[in-house]
Amino acid sequence: MPLNHLSLLVIFPLTLLVSESVIASKLIQPQYLDSERTDLFFAREIAQPSQENIDMRNSFDWGYELELSRTSGETKSVSNCKDLTKANLAGFTAAKAYEYGAFKAYLMQCQTWSEVAKLAASKRSFISKLKLDDNFPKFAPSALAFVISDESEEKVKTLPTWDEADHIQSTRVVSEVRAEYFDATGGFQVITVVAKGDYNADGIEDIVIEKENSVLSGLYSSSHGYVLTRMSEQASFTVLAEW
């Protein structure tokens, strides 16, 4: 019995709906893995990161204030990422010298949340089996190297991997998303996987990480964020973004 026009009008939209559902089910949704860090950052309990609320992280109140000042003598206090970012652009910095490291770490964390909010679902992944272990530095880009001078930075740019730049001596895996690396010059470096998702709309799953640098016999410290990607499971990582 031939289909009439009414039947076709019903079947066609249903076919499209089923097809869209199949495609959506094959997509790899963004993963937000920074719940522990988020819990430490805010004084009160907030909802776990999700695609719906991740972009709100910058406006959430921390539950405490950070004192800032600038060369004109003007001072102000901020208690959320949005205000901190604006103050930094206006020339404010930590009011107390010993809080400068915290000030820079806060800026980095706030920028990380802004970058994570850009993640979308991906179609393919070459990082599903990624582990923060002894092998990771051999595939990570030299941009992750612990540098404290312009001269060192220029030298590092000529090297292909993080391991070749810092000569990692030992690794301590803290969890599936965090590991500590000790280099040949007394550097102590912590890598945290913050999130996974498609950052640059090419359909490939990328990874957002944070890196904290310090020295075992000194006070120097720095914090950095990166988006890394690779085109096969055996390929080295490249940097898509850095802050």
Residue ranges with predicted function:
Residues 1-10:
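Bacterial N-terminal signal peptides that target proteins for export
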Residues 202:
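Acidic carboxylate motifs that coordinate Ca2+ or other divalent cations, activating on Asp/Glu
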Residues 25-197, 210-243:
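Beta-propeller-forming repeat regions
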Residues 11-12, 22-23:
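Cleavable N-terminal signal peptides
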Residues 206:
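Acidic Asp/Glu-based divalent-cation binding sites
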